[in-house]
Structures are given as C-alpha cells and as structure tokens.
C-alpha cells in the first residue's frame, strides 16, 4: 500500500512538473503544433492557393508591378 501511494505521489509531482513547463521547450513545441494545425493555421494555408492560380489578370500584373517598384 505504501509503494502504491509513493508511486501515486511521484507521478502527480511529475505531471505537475510537465504541466508547469509551458514557457519551456514543450510549450514552444505545443504552440507551434497549435498554430500549424489549428483552425487559423489551416485557414492561413488557404491564402497560398492563390499563388497556384494560373490565370493572371491585368489587375494582378499591375499590383505585382506596384509591389516591386
């Protein structure tokens, strides 16, 4: 019974340690995963579909010329 209680206490302490490392490496890794796979991250990937469009209009060409002046 004492061994089970000790294992429970140690596992709770380790879990608390993992949870509190939000500002460390695991936190940065989790934030990167959330931004890449989250709703906003996936929605932002849709913006790149415009680059694959083969139809370029005169307005698109004018915008590109203005952008690279």
From Swiss-Prot:
Position of the signal peptide: 1-23
Keyword Secreted: yes
Keywords: Amidation, Antimicrobial, Cleavage on pair of basic residues, Secreted, Signal
Tissue expression pattern: Expressed by the venom gland.
Positions of post-translational Leucine amide modification: 37
Top-level taxon of the source organism: Eukaryota
Family: Belongs to the non-disulfide-bridged peptide (NDBP) superfamily. Short antimicrobial peptide (group 4) family.
Role this protein plays: Probable antimicrobial peptide. Shows low inhibitory activity against herpes simplex virus type 1 (HSV-1).
Protein name as annotated: Antimicrobial peptide Eval36
Organism expressing this protein natively: Euscorpiops validus (Scorpion)
């Amino acid at each position: 019974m004492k061994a089970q209680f000790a294992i429970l206490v140690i596992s709770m302490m380790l879990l608390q340690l993992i949870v509190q490392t939000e500002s460390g490496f695991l936190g940065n890794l989790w934030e990167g995963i959330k931004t890449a796979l989250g709703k906003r991250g996936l929605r932002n990937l849709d913006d790149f579909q415009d680059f694959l469009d083969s139809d370029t209009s005169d307005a698109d060409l004018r915008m590109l010329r203005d952008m690279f002046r």
